[in-house]
Swiss-Prot record:
Residues 162-197 are annotated as: Disordered. Belongs to the universal ribosomal protein uL10 family. This is Large ribosomal subunit protein uL10. Signal peptide: none annotated. GO terms for biological process: translation. Keywords: Ribonucleoprotein, Ribosomal protein, RNA-binding, rRNA-binding. It holds the Pfam family Ribosomal_L10. One of its GO terms (cellular component) is large ribosomal subunit. The keyword Electron transport does not apply. The gene is rplJ. PANTHER family: 39S RIBOSOMAL PROTEIN L10, MITOCHONDRIAL. It comes from Paenarthrobacter aurescens (strain TC1). HAMAP family: Ribosomal_uL10. Residues 163-197 have a biased composition (Low complexity). Part of the ribosomal stalk of the 50S ribosomal subunit. The N-terminus interacts with L11 and the large rRNA to form the base of the stalk. The C-terminus forms an elongated spine to which L12 dimers bind in a sequential fashion forming a multimeric L10(L12)X complex.
Length: 197
């Protein structure tokens, strides 16, 4: 019999599947409430870790187009709906599962592709988005800082050359005046000689 609470639960789980870029199905048999709270804190705000009913989750998964979970929905089930960094969340889940053997990672979905437990572990082994962005920023920053150093070195070299050539530049007008006087002196002497004649 379908009740409004079941319809609402299916709608919520379906919505969680659709809004997430990844989801991981776990069995949590034997975990305490305190351990579940610790796991939720480790997963962060971008991941919703929900204890779910298997039959309702199967309906929601089908409505959301997530077929990977159907044969794995057995026993006490919780699903991590990941809306943020899937790598970081998968790492938090796998680290917690290593420390707490009661949490068993069964299967997952990442960007529409089904993952088995080994696939979730492989996802967790990837570098986090923040680390990847930091590496890209470092690669992009390196040529810019190298170019800045080259430009600064050229500027210093030009200043040094400009500083050394400044006295020469000041001497140049004086030399030009002396040369002009030398040219003018014979011309004046020739003019004076023609006037005398």
């Amino acid at each position: 019999m379908t009740t409004p609470s079941k319809i609402s639960a299916v709608a919520e789980i379906t919505n969680d599947f659709k809004e997430s870029n990844a989801a991981v199905l776990t069995e949590y048999r034997g975990l305490t409430v305190a351990q579940l709270k610790e796991l939720r804190v480790a997963l962060g705000q971008d991941t919703k870790f929900s204890v779910v009913k298997n039959t309702l989750s199967a309906i929601a998964a089908k409505e959301a187009g997530v077929e990977a979970f159907n044969d794995q929905l057995a026993g006490p089930t919780a699903i991590a709906f990941i809306k943020g960094d899937a790598v970081a969340a998968a790492k938090s889940l796998t680290d917690f599962a290593k420390a707490n053997k009661q949490l068993v990672i069964k299967t997952g979905v990442f960007e529409g592709k089904a993952l088995d437990a080994a696939g979730v572990a492989a996802l967790a082994a990837l570098e986090s988005r923040e680390l990847q962005l930091a590496r890209v920023a470092g690669v992009l920053k390196a040529p810019a800082s190298a170019a800045a150093r080259i430009i600064d070195a050229l500027r210093l070299k030009l200043e040094e050359e400009g500083g050394a050539s400044a006295p020469a530049a000041e001497e140049a007008p004086a030399a030009e005046e002396a040369a002009a006087e030398e040219v003018a002196a014979p011309a004046e002497a020739a003019e004076a000689a023609t006037e005398e004649n």
